[in-house]
Structures are given as C-alpha cells and as structure tokens.
Amino acid sequence: RTWLRIDFDGIRCVWCPLDCFFGAGTGAPASSNWYVSSDGKGTFTSRWVMPYAEHADLRLEKRTDIPFTAVITGYVDDFDWTAQTLYFHATYHDETSIPVNNDYNSPDNLDWNFTTITGRGVYCGDVLSLYNHCPDWYGEGDEKIWIDNDTFPSFMGTGTEDYYNCSWAPVVPFATPFGGAPRADEASSHGYNTFVRTRNLDVIPFGQRLQFDLEMLSWNPGAVDYRAAAFWYGTAASAATEKN
C-alpha cells in the first residue's frame, strides 16, 4: 500500500506500488533479478538506469494508516544527455474480477490489456501479480504485442507460463537473472501468483505505439484479479495506460 513516484525534469515517469516496482508483487516475498530484487524482509533494490537532464524528485506515498520508516539510498553519476536519451518509466495497471474462459474457440474470449504505450520508446520488462479465483491454471491464453502500425501482433506467444520463462505453471517460487515467479502459493495455481520478466537481451523498440494484451483463457471458467507493472524507456511525450 506504499507507492513510489519519481519525476524526472518535472515529468512523472514512475508511479507504481513498491511491491510491484521491485519485482516482488503482493506480499513482497524474496525475489532476485538482474534489475530488481527484494529480500522478503522490507529491503528492496532497483538497478535500472534512470537518466535525467536536470533534476529528479523521488517520493513515497503511503496509502495506509500503518506507520513505517523508510531509508532511501540512491547512486548518482554524470550522464551525457542527448536528444536521443529516453526517460525510464514504470507504470501500473490493476483490475479485479477479470473473467477467464475454457472455451478456447469462443468469439467472446477477452484480450486483457496489460499496457498500451504511445510515443517512441523501448519496452524492457514487466511484473504480473495476481489472485486466481479458479481451482487451477488460468494463463492458457496467448500473449500478444503489437508494434506501431501492426495489423497482426509482432509477438504472439503461447501462454503466461511461457512468457515468464516457466514452460509450465510454477509449482514453487523460483528466480533467474531474467525472470521468475517470486510467489506461487499452491501447485494447483489457485491463490496468489507473481511473475517477473526483465528483457536484458530482448528489449522491444517502438516508434509510435506498443500494445501488450493477454488472452484470458483457463482450464476452468472463473475470474482473476490482475496487478500489472510495465518497465520501459520513452520520450518526454510518451505515455502509458494507467488504471488503479
């Protein structure tokens, strides 16, 4: 319930709950990744490079009555800002009671929008933290990423487990330098799950627009609650969908 806001040169670029920003998700369990990590005890680390031309403003917003003490350490170095330099962004989107369907051929199946970014930029990773109300696997639908003026997705995957480098639904938490599942409450996939992926070697550049959707297909019909954080670089004019 604590949010991180960072403004670079007067532009709000980071607006995200702490647990998702640092790749841990709901409950903030231990998580280790090339760019973000959590020790599960309240210490978080981010290693994203966040350039700015003149000034940065970092704030924590507490959305709870529970008091806490925060110590923030930042590392700053010289940077040669040019006309091509992009700002780091972390944007957040959540929704509850999203329907999932096990009729894979139904024309009514939902494509849930993870994020849509307008303007020029580079997509670098994301976190999906969720509660699954279904008794078992909920992420059978394809992930779809459209770039600029695509009429068909440039990236068309085969399910949430493959997008997040699991190859099947995670039955225990695991971590790799590029992704993982910090939280997997039950082997059945019921309950809380969290996934993280950072695109260390496979960032996605775009010139005008990027749209990332997840097809909502499952083994059994039901509903899920999704919290989605996206990490990307963009110009001062670039913007992403936010719903929270």
What are these language model-derived features?
Residues 1-244:
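Beta-strand-centric surfaces of beta-sandwich/beta-rich domains
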